[in-house]
Amino acid sequence: MKRAYKDLQEFIQVLEAEGELLRIQKEVDPELEISEIYLRHAKEKDGGKAILFENVKGSDIPVLINAFGSYKRLSLAFGAHSLEDFMNELKSLVQIEIPEGFWGTMKKGWQIKDVLKYPPKRLNSRSASCQQVIYRGDEVDLSKIPVIKCWPDDGGPFVTLPLVFTKSLDGKKKNMGLYRMQVYDKNTTGMHWQMHKDGSHFHGEYRKASKRMEVAVAIGADPASVYCGTAPLPPGVYEMFFSGFLRGSGAEMVKCVSVDLEVP
């Protein structure tokens, strides 16, 4: 039922083979124009198609949008024959309530055993595609990334689908969440994590201890990992375990260059 996409590029190839991808080669502006084109296209029957903007003003990096904007594309993203059956399976997992106490946890353990069968796999950094090009210090320039501004009254451009990786102060808990990031300048962003999110809870621990918190961000990950950034999982279940479950194979991770965290 499940298929493990190695990366976003492989998913794009499947979308194109299924007639679900529209390529735009004309130059487009990341400030308002991309979001306007998407908004009009998404109103078409069945949510239109996924759009790949290949020529974005000011950047050499293409932008994919509307990749999950229809039932068919969601089915393709998870390799599911029946999206309804697949979503019912997910619902049974994310609604699990983990009781207090050892025996209560043991009784419920069977319900999440399938999720825990697929732990992340740590790869050698030399084989990591996300570290083929590395910028350090003054080389860092976020304007190289085509971050879009969606609405006229937005405070600026926002990274809207970042996978944000953090860990607790004692290092025993990990979190991957999808939190919007406003780009302020070439090497500074804001982080919008709500008070009830794990990333915010971890940040509170570090602030109370007067310590800096390490954060890693992945952009353009595989479909399963992107979904898991928003999944309402049971307490204590690391999102990348769930990503492995959806993929049917442990998510491949690599240690970051400048922080003690791992990313896809």
Short names for language-model regions:
Residues 1-264:
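Extended, highly charged
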